[in-house]
Amino acid sequence: MTTAHTTAVTAAMIKPDELRQRREYSPVDWHFAAMIVRHCARRDAPPDELQLLEIAAATAISCVRRSHSCLNLQQWCGQCQSASPLPDAKSWRTVLSHFPTAVCTEDNPASPPSAPMTLCGDLLYLSRFRQCERRIAARLRDFLEDAPTAGTPTPAELDAIRRICRHFANADPAQNRQMQAVAKSLSSRLLALTGGPGTGKTTVMTVIMALQLAAHPEMRIALAAPTGKAAGRMKEAIANELRHSLTGLEENAMRRLEALAPQTLHRLLEINPDTGVAGRNRERPLTAELVVVDECSMTSLQLFSQLMEALPANARLILIGDKNQLASVESGVVFGEICNFLSRHSPMQLCTLVENHRSGGNRNLCDFAQALVGGHGTPDFRLLANGLNQQNGVFRHLPLDGSGLTGALRKTLEACRIPIDAWRQCGSPGQAFEFCDNFKILCAIRAGKFGVVNLNLQMCDCLGMRPEEYPDGMPVMILENDA
């Protein structure tokens, strides 16, 4: 009866061919879906149900390619526009439950865990991503078991914090969030530290490590970041803090901090570049007693899961990043979700830094950015422009004229006194890098007229470069390190 009822409901509904040409889908999505239907579907299944299984599988993997960890059936049903009607979320759940070898249903104990997809309420996962979420959640529960209930530092702890960092010498811990973050780290094995650029995350991180080494001189510390570039910046930022912020640190602790070498998470976890399997795991955990990860918002769901699996049982973990930053290129918004989770269930393990110490003098720009982050409607760009001009005259509005976007870019470079043809005279790689570092064009989006892809092409026109020929002096980005 259930199958007959579902078939009647879905007979006039959407078919795979109606979705194949949509830009959110790739041919690989439909190849994956066809494989699921071929290997996991019952031979006696109604054709309409098989088509819905195919659509669900293709859409689930399409979501992963677009950096989501799963397909939210409820949202998708409300947002997907098509000539034929979509089943509602309840109908999707009913149909998918008819294919237990393809879809594991979490609320059904009889459902085989080996299925390639997993249904959790209205969320349809590729099973390995659901397993990643479960591993991260299990480790977070371990951290929550010994979470502090109060975060008031002792007088001795406050004295140590003030003594070790000159910025905190006369600071009030009730008002200074950086001091609060340091104090929280002393009483908990987990700290998530989030804040925008210039809010002092590196200062907090360095002070925490200095205090730990002062108390435990032989503590093993591992520093990591998602990319080699981020790891390099981490090293430079720590060196800068050691030169300008830390005071009263014993020579041995200073040497230990100077010797710390941040590495990529892939290298830390000994991930095989061919298989993606981590050499460090639950059976062979890391040897570090304190693990510090920077730029966490760039870390994917799978990489976060591998990190959590490799942590020793009693290790301390400090996660640093900006939860409002763009998400990982791969699936998941893990750091943001962890911050949201801790804010609800364990606020003593979360600290949010809001004061911008780097750009604090530029009040107009800081207020504008804060309005965007806070979601207080769309800020008025004209007010921002007027404020910036009154402050230092740096804002220029360049309307597009007959010369188009390329002409506007050329005028911008000329107004900023950037010698357009200087790249042709670069006699060495060092000079070429220096020219590239003279200016940067930032885009809010990747695609579209004002996106990264198009503006890079326009810049090639401005500079007289033929991108397909890769001329000397043309900047390139390495997308994969296969060494």
Residue ranges and their predicted role:
Residues 179-182, 186-389:
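ASCE P-loop NTPase helicase motor core
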